[in-house]
Amino acid sequence: MKRTKSIRHASFRKNWSARHLTPVALAVATVFMLASCEKSDETVSLYQNADDCSAANPGKSAECTTAYNNALKEAERTAPKYATREDCVAEFGEGQCQQAPAQAGMAPENQAQAQQSSGSFWMPLMAGYMMGRLMGGGAGFAQQPLFSSKNPASPAYGKYTDATGKNYGAAQPGRTMTVPKTAMAPKPATTTTVTRGGFGESIAKQSTMQRSATGTSSRSMGG
């Protein structure tokens, strides 16, 4: 009887350990998986136009032109849209806005509202674009339009930002940088107009999130 009791106790301890350690093991595995994903970065180059890209990549003129034109189309689809030129200029500065092409990602009802108020809606000019390899290791290139403001009061002043408001540093073409692969993923189409200053608020929020993530990572690394 004593032996049986001993065996049962051992079995209980084994089962208890399995039940309580399994979540910990899963958590550790998840951390390693996340860390692996975070390291899946990509090196991209920032250009103002196809000529800049061609000059930096001799023999790749056709690819540069294709990437630039695709970035322009993506900008039309995903750039912040404004009901009036004044709202766009207040965010991006004089000479930095253009009328958005019809059907450029806007929902029909919002398009009608903007057209009723000003004849069309407005969007910032594409200030540059990121160019990198296609996700999945394809032979082609991926691209992402970038925007910048010339209004000193805007959070986007002198910086490159994507359509979501994520900041990629100084608006200086010719740079090479490392970004998460998600940075090159297609962005959602813009389906509503942005209020004056709304895109700047998005940039400020993104910057706060980036600083918070960096701080958390630093604290974790430091123990």
Swiss-Prot record:
Polar residues composition bias: residue spans: 204-223
Coiled-coil blocks: none
Organism from which the protein derives: Shigella boydii serotype 4 (strain Sb227)
Skewed-composition ranges (Low complexity): 178-195
Protein family membership: Belongs to the UPF0441 family.
UniProt protein name: UPF0441 protein YgiB
Region named Disordered: 178-223
Entry-linked Pfam families: DUF1190
